[in-house]
Amino acid sequence: MSSNEPVVLDNGTGYVKCGFASSESPIVFPSCVGRPVLRVEEALASNSSNEKRSVVGQECIDNRQNYEISYPIKNGIVTSWPDMILVWEHAIYEKLGLTKEEIGNRMILLTEAPQNPRKNREKMVEIMFEHFGFKGVFVHVQAVLTLYAQGLLTGLVLDSGDGVSHVVPVIDGFTKRQATKRLDIAGRTVTERLIELLGRRGYAVGRTSDVDSIREMKESVCFVAEERKRWLRLARETTACAELYELPDGRRIKVESERFMAPEIMFEPSLVGVESVGVSELVFECVQECDMDSRMTMYENIVLSGGSTTFPGFGERLKKDLVDLYTDRILKGDPNRDVGKFANRVNVETPVDRKYSVFVGGSVLANIMKDNDTFWVTKREYEELGIEKAMKKCEGTFHE
């Protein structure tokens, strides 16, 4: 790795993925900050600041009983800048091992959510220059980077991570803001739903210390049912979907219909009281809001991204739902119109490494840009032009 290799930093609600432009895979850690839970007398006796006693990432998760944990990113948007700086310091100084001197010779590529407010984007850049001292900064939309990882410039991205799901149409590298959809249901919500469903059957798994164990269970045994009613019948009448799972503390849990009913909330949010259509209908609505001549291209290039799309059966369910919606709403159920032609053209890409597609796409782009400073917003431009004018260099990557 050269001394001026660009840094790539993908900021997720639940996890940060960081590395360099040449990295084949990212370093991943929880995007959280933990502050010690102190008794009253300890708090009164303490003269040190909370910031000095804060921990970041896996350490506070492993010792969550001792910390009050907060996440600086909520539903894809930064809500606490002091905590976000702590997370970035952990990524840049500790995980990547960079010194202040090394940072001054490097560029950094940051990712942002599809509907990130302009003021947040500018704040990110300001911190990278003023607090860290990077030589140059570039900010790119996560959905576009997902397509870059697939070698595409046009397509529709369904990205679902830990805290939020987005459906984003991209045409020639530009996102269509007006057609972008958001659902505040993703991995964390599915974990909470699994805890709730298991609790209904008498399993006491609602303790704070159980959350990570149940998340691991979710990732191990859950799947998306292509036909929910059929699987519910199988769960009632057979043991076809029953699986015994052992928690790290030795407790054994028999998981049955919970395996598919937990992730079902992504397709039917009303199951948890959320007034929204599910991801399949969001994809359908998104495509229908695109120009007529680009709709079929969208259907032919649907790309899944993020850890919450990795449930077995996710892609198959999405395609089935889209064909059903097209048959019902476009063909109006007309038996004389051939839905088979449409079904054959719907293509849902399920990249093996889609947990890290955004980071991979960022690495690809940073590699292309690394030897040309004119691509980046440089510190000199930032100081001479101000943040608003300097950021115009990147506006072509932002939303239409």
Regions found by a protein language model. Name each.
Residues M1-P6, N120, E130, F134-L158, ...:
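Conserved phosphate-binding catalytic cores of ATP/NTP-utilizing and phosphoryl-transfer enzymes
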Residues S2-I127, G136-F138, H166, K176-T180, ...:
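Conserved phosphate-binding loops in N-terminal lobes of ATP-dependent enzymes
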Residues L9-G14, Q150-L152, V157-S165, V170-F174, ...:
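A short acidic Gly-Thr/Ser loop motif
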Residues V87-K95, M261, F267-M298, R317:
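Phosphate/ATP-binding catalytic cores across multiple sugar-kinase/actin-like superfamilies
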Residues T111-N120, M128, E226, E300-D321, ...:
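Glycine-rich phosphate-binding loops at beta-strand->alpha-helix junctions
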Residues I171-G273, E300-N301:
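Phosphate-binding glycine-rich/basic clefts of nucleotide- and phosphate-handling proteins
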Residues E196, A204-E243, D334-P335, V339-E400:
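Acidic, glycine/GT-rich loop-and beta-edge segments that sit at the periphery of enzyme/chaperone cores
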Residues V303, F311-K341, N367:
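Catalytic phosphate/nucleotide-handling subdomain of diverse soluble enzymes
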